[in-house]
């Protein structure tokens, strides 16, 4: 937990030193062969796997403000999809879903937390639906989902795109989306606009022609099959269609969570990196509770046991939040689950009188009077001033006479 808190405190400082951080971490890069092409990838860090999927306009560099920071605590992979960055152009029909699966296979990624930006979010959803065992959590950023429509407002950019034919000219398209479009990048985020131009001018989007193979089934119709923790992020000033898509995703995926990032358009990781990173790390650092909420007690315990097998001293939760979840379960009548949560809390925080007091209360509600007495006594031993434990013991032991 100390390491987690330290990481959060350092985010602001690190964001001003990303270049030096990227130089400091060891980045492995290269190409993997896929059916009819090559994909360029970069990989850094150690720990749980994270895979970063870029949007439909830029390339892997959209994650420049996140890649080195995430690599401090995770094994992070980012790559250019076909037609982007350093990856090859398609010469035959190809599937982004199967390309991503090859990233997993060839880079020895058993399971990963997948970040998907815009169209990359749609890919993340489609991949999760086809290969559910490979994805442990999703972070969807300005995501659009296949199978849900786009309005005319999206097509003409709210009337701001006067001549759609201009977008066939790469330079005119760059100028429009960087400086004229009110949705792609919020007007005040000038540095993000400059970065956007730099990325596109160095690696302009290439057409996939008729080679792109869509998903077997539209993701929008099958969102309820996704049962993992999902965080949905949308920029305050993103185009209304993207907000609509995010609503469809949130409604469709059980227990998913949506947040709005202020003062941002579509490209949140470029526009508001500090707010984005803070929100993402909060989600990542609460993964035990995310799993508990979305998948239930058994999955959360399994996650905890796997983590403890690698590091017996690891603390994956805050004492106060675990206590709050325990009482939430008590209120919902999930007494057995509440007991298990409070037991985990005293195991993680054996010096906490409050943790033992709460466990005693749960045991009492579960009808386990002897265990309640034992834990109230432990609480009182740790804190002789705990009047609640003293009163409870007087009543419980008096009832034994």
PLM feature spans:
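Conserved HGGG/HGGXW glycine-rich cap/lid loop of the alpha/beta-hydrolase fold
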Residues: 37-86
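Active-site loop/oxyanion-hole signature of alpha/beta-hydrolase fold enzymes
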Residues: 78-115, 119
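Flexible "cap/lid" loop of the alpha/beta hydrolase fold
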Residues: 129, 138-167
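Conserved alpha/beta-hydrolase catalytic His-Asp/Glu region
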Residues: 149-150, 168-224
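Short beta-strand/loop motif that positions the catalytic acidic residue
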Residues: 226, 232-234
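Catalytic active-site module of serine/aspartate enzymes centered on a nucleophile-bearing elbow/loop
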Residues: 256-294
């Amino acid at each position: 937990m100390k390491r987690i808190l330290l990481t959060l405190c350092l985010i602001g400082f690190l964001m001003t030193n990303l270049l030096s951080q990227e130089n400091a971490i060891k980045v492995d890069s290269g190409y993997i062969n896929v059916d009819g092409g090559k994909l360029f990838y970069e990989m850094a860090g150690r720990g749980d796997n994270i895979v970063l999927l870029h949007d439909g306009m830029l390339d892997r560099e959209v994650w420049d403000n996140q890649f080195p920071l995430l690599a401090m605590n995770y094994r992070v992979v980012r790559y250019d999809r076909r037609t982007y960055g350093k990856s090859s152009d398609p010469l035959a029909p190809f599937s982004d879903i199967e390309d991503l699966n090859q990233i997993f296979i060839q880079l020895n990624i058993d399971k990963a937390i997948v970040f998907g930006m815009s169209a990359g979010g749609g890919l993340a959803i489609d991949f999760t639906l086809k290969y559910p065992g490979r994805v442990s959590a999703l972070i969807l950023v300005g995501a659009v989902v296949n199978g849900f429509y786009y309005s005319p407002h999206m097509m003409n950019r709210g009337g701001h795109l006067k001549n759609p034919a201009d977008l066939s000219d790469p330079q005119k398209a760059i100028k429009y989306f960087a400086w004229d479009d009110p949705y792609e990048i919020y007007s005040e985020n000038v540095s993000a606009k400059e970065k956007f131009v730099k990325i596109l001018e160095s690696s302009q989007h290439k057409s996939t022609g008729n080679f792109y193979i869509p998903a077997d089934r539209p993701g929008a119709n099958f969102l309820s099959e996704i049962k993992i923790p999902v965080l949905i992020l949308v920029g305050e000033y993103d185009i209304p269609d993207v907000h609509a898509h995010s609503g469809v995703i949130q409604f469709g995926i059980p227990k998913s969570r949506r947040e709005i990032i202020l003062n941002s358009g579509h490209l949140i990781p470029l526009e508001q990196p500090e707010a984005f990173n803070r929100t993402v790390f909060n989600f990542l650092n609460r993964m035990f509770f995310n799993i508990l909420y979305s998948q239930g007690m058994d999955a959360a315990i399994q996650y905890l046991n796997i983590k403890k097998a690698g590091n017996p001293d690891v603390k994956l939760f805050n004492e106060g939040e675990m206590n709050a979840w325990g009482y939430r379960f008590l209120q919902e009548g999930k007494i057995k689950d509440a007991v298990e949560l409070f037991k985990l809390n005293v195991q993680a925080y054996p010096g906490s009188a409050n943790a033992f007091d709460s466990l005693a209360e749960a045991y009492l509600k579960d009808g386990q009077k002897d265990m309640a007495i034992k834990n109230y006594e432990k609480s009182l031993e740790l804190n002789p001033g705990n009047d609640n434990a003293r009163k409870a013991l007087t009543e419980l032991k008096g009832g034994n006479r």
